[in-house]
Amino acid sequence: MTVLSHLKQVQQRNVATLRRSPLAEISGALGDLGTLLPLMIALAVQGSIYLDSTLVFSGISNIVTGAVFGIPLPVQPMKSIAAAAISRPEYGKIHTVMAAGQWVSLAVLAMSLTGLLRWVTRNVPVPVVKGIQLGAGLSLVMAAGSSLLRDLDWTRPVIDNQLWALGAFLVLIFTQRLPRFPYALCVFVLSLAFAFVAVETKDGDVHILLQMMPNADVWEPRRWLHWNLNWFEYKPISMAIGQLPLTTLNSVIAVSALAADLLPDMPTPSVTSMGISVGLMNLVGTWWGAMPVCHGAGGLAAQYRFGARSGASIIMLGLLKLILGVVFGNSLIGLLKHYPKSLLGVMVIAAGLELAKVGHSLNHGASDLWETSAGEAGDGSGGITRHHRTLSDDERSERWTVMLMTTAGILAFRNDAIGFVAGMLCFWAYRLSDKTQKWWEGRKSITSGETAPLLR
């Protein structure tokens, strides 16, 4: 299949899906705001990124990925880099953040082009990948509770409190069996209305309040960062080292596996194409101060949870970002700072639970449990058949243990790399135990054969 024919098929599928369920696609496009908004706003306020460039280039990335892959792949912040820039002021300079993003992108791009990512994917067991997804999902739930919902009062302020969070959560539960209900779209519209009300009713100087409202601030791509990105300083390199395992495992390997689980009827993007996509997104946008971004399993789960089933959803999101970035740019910061945490937190929880749910297929339906054989098909004609491998109780227990060990490492140390190492060590320990047991049984059979009498 040529590139043009592939793109034509993808666009036909995108259009057909959008026509079939337009509200679901629009709602799904907004499903990942819980991950995007808090980090993007925090980085923009402290000057670590340019909000206008971030909206423009992340919007372009959304449009391109939706048109090329045809599934709702998210464009998310690089969380480890963002966390370091926010928590440590000396790491928050824009040139440092951009250099860190470029280091990660260069590394992922090199791994993709050399085939190293494919080798890693073949040799990472499914229970470890599932553990990374489960850990990422539970991390989102915990982050929603600790950073968005915990400090809210029950009744104050009137438009952002725990009662609103409880109400949003109950509506989420009641509508979970109504796939066409545009939950994220409704929450987004309500949140924007609350943000406008919060700004309008805020006490202070009228001129300051007017500055907090969006106004025409047309983006001009003149803030070129040139070559002064401090590439070889310790700070960007250390930030990149912390981000690389997260990007490789969660934004490339795990998101490819999750796409196969959630959208089995759609062509699954390869880890190589995911890596190239991450590399190119940042090697372009970071020169203009755009936030370092990647794909992510959590974002895909969130957009799927709220209705997205094709690339049409993120193409619409990309167009919205592009328009906002070009027309309003940095004037949006004041409004976005008042986005209600109560409603945002519930969306993050829903996204985390959707991602964590993929762990249920570990012992039934996982990709490594399907076996292919040549033989008679059901209609009597010869062909290739697929059947599900039956696991013993010991195998089920072993796979659960490896997955939970991976998840435990992620949650305990808040680090995907440590969780990955813990899961792999657990997996290899089981393999070593199996080989040791076989060797010992072989020794016992040889010994018993040597000591048996010749005549009976």
Q: Residue spans of the language-model regions?
A:
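Intrinsically disordered, low-complexity regions flanking or connecting the multi-pass transmembrane cores
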Residues: 1-20, 24, 122, 379-381, ...
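Membrane-embedded helical hairpins/re-entrant loop segments and their flanking transmembrane helices
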Residues: 2-23, 42-64, 239-311
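Transmembrane alpha-helix interface/packing and boundary motifs in multi-pass membrane proteins
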Residues: 27-28, 63-73, 241-246, 280-290, ...
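Hydrophobic, membrane-embedded alpha-helices of multi-pass small-molecule transporters
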Residues: 23-34, 160, 164-168, 200, ...
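Hydrophobic alpha-helical transmembrane segments of multi-pass membrane proteins
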Residues: 27-30, 124-128, 158, 238-248, ...
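Transmembrane helix-boundary motif of multi-pass solute transporters/channels
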Residues: 27-89
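Hydrophobic, membrane-inserted alpha-helices
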Residues: 35-41, 58-62, 79-84, 164-173, ...
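Membrane-embedded alpha-helical modules
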Residues: 90-202, 316, 320-456
